[in-house]
Amino acid sequence: MAPPITDDDLDGLKQPYVTFSSGSASPPRSTAEAMDFEEQILEAIKSDAFLVDWIGEDDKGNPQNLPYWRKWVITMSLALYALSTTFSSSVFGAATHVLAEEFALPAETVVLGCTSLFMVGFATGPIFWGPFSEAFGRTRPLLAGYLGFAVLQLPIADARSLTSICILRFLGGFFGAAPSSILSGILADIWSPRERGFAMPTVGAFLTIGPILGPLIGSVLVQSVLGWRWIANVVAIASFLIALSTFPFLPETYTPLLLARRAERMRHMTRNWAYRSKSEEAQSSIGDFAERYLLRPARMLALEPILLMMTLYVSVSFGLLYNFFLAYPTSFIQERGWDQTTASLPLISILVGAIIAGALLSFSTNSRWAPNAKEGRPQETRLLLMMVGAVSLPAGMFLFAWTSSATMNPWPQILSGIPTGFGIHLINMQGMNYIIDSYKIYANSAIAANTFLRSLFAAGFPILATSMYAAIGVKWGTTILALLAVAMIPIPILFYYFGAKIRAKSKWQPPL
């Protein structure tokens, strides 16, 4: 049997060939001894002695230790990406009737091409951008996707057919999905779970504000001398300005990639090729990515009651938001006789409601309305605020529907947007947070399923609304949708009382 190896023997790994010091065990003479000695060397190499990780909690290379101001610069940059891409998702809705006249097509066809196809691209984008962010880090796919989104706005302004617009809008949604697919990962990279309670609602508010601002600004552009083509130019200019002002301050934050880079530097500095990171030990294949972003999300959505019902509820509320981008113009233009720009102003009330909800979420982060295992508050605690939103949403919708008559004062209908926006934002944010809490290490797969279905609902509701409001009007059309929102109210109540038991039986329940 070969003598045991010493530290001096391991030092030899720093050279191109293994060497032995004069005070170490002599090289093995027999084949058996040589094989035994090599096995010991390999075991030493495989040990954690050469595994590269963060050096203590204060390691400056760890994104969690970035300066506080730098974290907020990154967070607000992500918020601006979310704002501009979601703004683009709804802004062309203001040009629906103008485009229908210019291309001599039905309004439903224009809605399909300008809004719905963008959201279909937004739904399919995460299937690509999620794996891309794990293989190449956060910044590369974020920059590639956002710049692609900005560039694709330019040819829309010169498009001569609705077919061209449809293709460009779909691709714009696909590339524009990159920030939304990656931002939650970046926030998790730089903020602790407690700090994330403030950062996530901030970014989430911009995700809701963006599509609300779209019809407001779009209406102004359509009615101005600039015309509908400048909608795309404005989105492009704003996106390029955001990119130029934020990209220089956006570092790589993906821990596996940062540690792999550190391991590579150490290998070249020491000539010791045994240094490696955990991510280099477990290289992901195409099959792994397919499992994580296609197969597992589909299985979880089909087999997990919490994910299925919460995703359905969040998707309906998100679809209702896009429905209102058609309901408001239909009611205030066609029924009350307002001009397009003035008719878009009542949407501000939905924005106000969303901002109030965002402020409430930030305030409640460290209150009894937030989960806290040490104080005996389970994950289901956050569903209390979701219940508030569940009641607020249909209340606002009923008020909007039953005060829509042209003979009634418009202010009750205008102010109905406050409880509507308040409810939509609470349902979306608390539903997403509950999904993340429930599946933790499988949250990426759960969110991938949620994002896909949510975007499809946002694509489908405007098409439904166009036909429905034309057939039965705003009052009864919105009443039917409000009843759908009422039917969803039991979902957070059910999981508040039985969610813990359901999670305990889950195949994807993470270990404690």
Curated annotation (Swiss-Prot):
Recorded GO cellular component terms are: plasma membrane
The main location class comes to membrane
The cysteines covalently paired via disulfide bonds are: none
Q: Tell me what induces its expression.
A: Expression is positively regulated by the cercosporin cluster-specific transcription factor CTB8. Expression is also affected by nitrogen and carbon sources and pH, and is also controlled by another transcription activator, CRG1, previously shown to regulate cercosporin production and resistance.
Q: Which InterPro entries match?
A: MFS, MFS_dom, MFS_trans_sf
Membrane topology according to the record: Multi-pass membrane protein
Q: What does the record give as the function of this protein?
A: MFS transporter; part of the gene cluster that mediates the biosynthesis of cercosporin, a light-activated, non-host-selective toxin. The perylenequinone chromophore of cercosporin absorbs light energy to attain an electronically-activated triplet state and produces active oxygen species such as the hydroxyl radical, superoxide, hydrogen peroxide or singlet oxygen upon reaction with oxygen molecules. These reactive oxygen species cause damage to various cellular components including lipids, proteins and nucleic acids.
This chain's protein is named Cercosporin MFS transporter CTB4
Organism per entry: Cercospora nicotianae
Query: What's the source species' lineage?
Result: Eukaryota, Fungi, Dikarya, Ascomycota, Pezizomycotina
